Amino acid sequence: MDATSAPHRIPPEMPQYGEDYHIFEMMQSMLEQLLIHQPEDPISFMISHLRRNNDNVPRVVILGPPASGKTTIAMWLCKHLNSNLITKENLLEREFSLLSLEAKKHYQVYKRVPNSTLVSLVQERLNEDDCLRRGWILDGIPERREQALMIQTLGLAPKHVIVLSAPDSVLIERNVGKRIDPVTGEIYHTTFDWPPELEIQNRLIQPEGISEIDTAKKLLEYHRHIIRILPSYPKILKTISSDQPCVDVFYQALTYVQSGHRCNAPFTPKVLLCGPMGCGKKLQAALLSQKYGLVNISCGQLLKEAMAAESSLGDLIEPFFEKRMTVPDSIITRVLTERLKQQDCIQKGWVLHGFPRDLDQARLLNSMGYSPNRVFFLNVPLDSILERLTLRRTDPVTGERFHLMYKPPPTIEVQARLLQNPKDSEEYIKLQTDLFYRNSGDLEQYYDRAIIVNGDQDPYTVFEYIESGIINPLPRKVT
């Protein structure tokens, strides 16, 4: 590169390509695996790693006290994510494994498995092809801090650790009524989850060691070990209360497992705000611009600026404004392209609102090479929109704007001279809102990773939701 031609500017296509294909994350993952496994032939190792394409498979650890429901949640997660459930029981029952046979004999005599043996069983299972391809969910493993450290030393690092918690009194009550279906392995309860089928009821069995005294002993042992395990997973740990319906626990666990952790990859926000008029797009765009320095791009404002500048594009726009007609998409995209390709948008990122309004415009924006990496739909009921807009008034003398409910005029004299913008009439608002929602379904389907935000709340609460959606990685879709 010629040093005399500085300053050098990276073409905008390069970071866009890296972001689209997750180049940074891919290189980071390969480097991690190289340092963990230290292969003699790094090139062949990296090629096989790329062919495996398993960076995003679930690697989850679920911990919790007896009767917390961790096995049920783990089974549901496995079915939903098409992953492999790994428990101490199925590790001991594996066929064609000498290690499992030895561990089972030891367990039958001493009622426990040595730490090193259990970790070796875990390593053996996780290195099998189905676990490499589809990921794994460890149920109740590790049981002790020593096991957690040994697993980490082997480079078997989970991406998400879920810890279920509930009061001991609740857990004891649950455990006493626990029943197991020997055919399917499903867990039922005499009070909370009794099967309706008589056939299943008749074959249920009561597991050993679920009396109140036995459960209290197990809880005591669990509490003694869990406080030493948790510091091993400081940044990937989430505690979920299991003293709630099982479906709610599962939903929280699934949401966490599908979420990604923050990455060090370079990220330039390109935000699109969609919503009906009066939903607060302009305010949210201004707040994002103020806090993060994003370039605030209002499509309508851009068209007015182009017309005021008396440019060639402005001459094309002016007749449509004078006749109050919709500006053609071809002209709008030319104005947008001129703005989005400027250096401040490339360096700082941007927040766009007012375009696209329908599916064709969304496809047009994407074909221009300016697809957003965060899309938010602000949903507000029509009643709230009417309340926000129809009560707006302007003082023609001072230019000050009022709202008859939230910011009333100070005197009767001022109130008497207030005027309403024709665009704030109820008929016009209903027409525009109906037009937006007629096209919003196609837009939401096109931007299938968009985030839906309830815009009918305090604007700073809405901003916090949008901010969270920008800062945190988008949740992964289950295929």
UniProtKB/Swiss-Prot annotation:
Residues 391-424 are annotated as: LID 2. GO terms for cellular component: 9+2 motile cilium; axoneme; cytoplasm; cytosol; sperm flagellum. Gene3D superfamilies: P-loop containing nucleotide triphosphate hydrolases (3.40.50.300). Keywords: ATP-binding, Cell projection, Cytoplasm, Cytoskeleton, Kinase, Nucleotide-binding, Transferase. Its EC number is 2.7.4.3, 2.7.4.6. AMP 1 binds at G140, I141, P142, E143, Q147, R203. GO terms for molecular function: (d)CMP kinase activity; adenylate kinase activity; AMP binding; ATP binding; nucleoside diphosphate kinase activity. Residues 87-113 are annotated as: NMP 1. Residues 58-258 are annotated as: Adenylate kinase 1. Belongs to the adenylate kinase family. It catalyses: AMP + ATP = 2 ADP; a 2'-deoxyribonucleoside 5'-diphosphate + ATP = a 2'-deoxyribonucleoside 5'-triphosphate + ADP; a ribonucleoside 5'-diphosphate + ATP = a ribonucleoside 5'-triphosphate + ADP. GO terms for biological process: ventricular system development. Interacts with CFAP45 and CFAP52; CFAP45 and AK8 dimerization may create a cavity at the interface of the dimer that can accommodate AMP. Residues 298-327 are annotated as: NMP 2. ATP 1 binds at A67, S68, G69, K70, T71, T72. SUPFAM superfamilies: Microbial and mitochondrial ADK, insert 'zinc finger' domain (SSF57774), P-loop containing nucleoside triphosphate hydrolases (SSF52540). InterPro entries: Adenylat/UMP-CMP_kin (IPR000850), ADK_active_lid_dom_sf (IPR036193), P-loop_NTPase (IPR027417). Nucleoside monophosphate (NMP) kinase that catalyzes the reversible transfer of the terminal phosphate group between nucleoside triphosphates and monophosphates. Has highest activity toward AMP, and weaker activity toward dAMP, CMP and dCMP. Also displays broad nucleoside diphosphate kinase activity. Residues 177-206 are annotated as: LID 1. AMP 2 binds at M325, T326, V327, G354, F355, P356, R357, Q361. It comes from Rattus norvegicus (Rat). It is found in: Cytoplasm, Cytosol; Cytoplasm, Cytoskeleton, Cilium axoneme. Its main location: cytoplasm. This is Adenylate kinase 8.
